[in-house]
Amino acid sequence: MFADQQSVQRAVYLALAKLARPSCAAIFEEFLLPDGRSAQSELDRRGMGPQEFVQSLLFVDGRRATACQDGGSVLITTPGSLLIRVCPGFAQVGSRLSATLVIHEALHALGLGENPPSSRDITDRVNRRCW
């Protein structure tokens, strides 16, 4: 167990509740993966829904990760990886943003890269769909 694990559990629970709404789950249709398919098509290929996929993510202590040490991120992953590193400070992020970031990282875990779309664009679009 790591320091922010309870905060992660709360964020995942709230993200799952939001993804139960079709309008929020539709975020996976909005983003295209590098091969041109939607994130939803990757979920379909895996035989999973958004909620089931979020539950498959593995959250681990990321305090030693270089990207966490710069202080600019609270969750990090590599596109296509189910491993999400939790940076110090995640517990200080509000519940709405923390759940949004879980969904944001789920999109990366399905293969979505960044720049483009920017990290802010991903987060803003998740916010619009899910809140």
Residue ranges, per PLM feature:
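Predominantly extracellular/secreted Zn2+-dependent metalloproteases
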Residues: 1-99, 109-131
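Walker B catalytic acidic pair
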Residues: 105
